[in-house]
Design a protein with these regions (language model features):
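Active-site residues of response regulator receiver
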Residues: 60
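Short amphipathic alpha-helix used as the core "switch/output" element in two-component signaling
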Residues: 47, 69-80
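His-Asp phosphorelay/catalytic-motif detector in bacterial-type signaling
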Residues: 53-55, 79-83
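Receiver (REC) domain active-site loop signature in two-component systems and cognate sites
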Residues: 63
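Helix N-cap/capping motif at the beta->alpha junctions
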Residues: 38-47, 68
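Conserved acidic segment of CheY-like receiver
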Residues: 9-20, 25-29, 57
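Non-catalytic signal-transmission and effector/linker regions of two-component phosphorelay proteins
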Residues: 1-11, 109-124
Length: 124
């Protein structure tokens, strides 16, 4: 009897200080077949990003403990092959844009975010 080979599910880490955004991202990506881990603390998110191998990390730019630039820098330093997507409602400086693989405005997240993450995960 033949076995069906399925591609393993991709695992995402979403880091945002807004519980509502995290809930939205979880629902959106789980409906698209991803395994989603969410974290509201930037520092704990960084710990998770270094402890586990995620297929992509999504993060907010403005967070209280650590801003998105510093968080992206640390993830890039510790996990250089992990795609990082900045999701933000504010303008992202060019220096930060150069640290990440993609920037998606929060107001366009529902249209653009899943396709951006899928494209980056397929690169791996």
């Amino acid at each position: 009897m033949g076995e069906i080979c399925q591609e393993p599910q991709k695992m995402l880490l979403c880091i945002d200080d807004s519980p509502a955004i995290l809930k939205y991202e979880r629902r959106m990506f789980e409906q698209s077949g991803y395994i989603v881990v969410t974290e509201a603390s930037a520092r704990r998110g960084l710990q998770l990003a270094t402890m586990y191998s995620f297929d992509a990390v999504l993060l907010d730019y403005r967070m209280p403990e650590m801003n998105g630039h510093d968080l992206a820098y640390e993830i890039r330093r510790l996990r250089p092959d992990t795609p990082v997507v900045m999701v933000s409602g504010s303008e992202i400086p060019e220096e930060t844009r150069q640290l990440v693989d993609a920037v998606v405005p929060k107001e366009e997240a529902n249209r653009e975010l899943v396709s951006t993450v899928a494209r980056l995960c397929d690169r791996l």
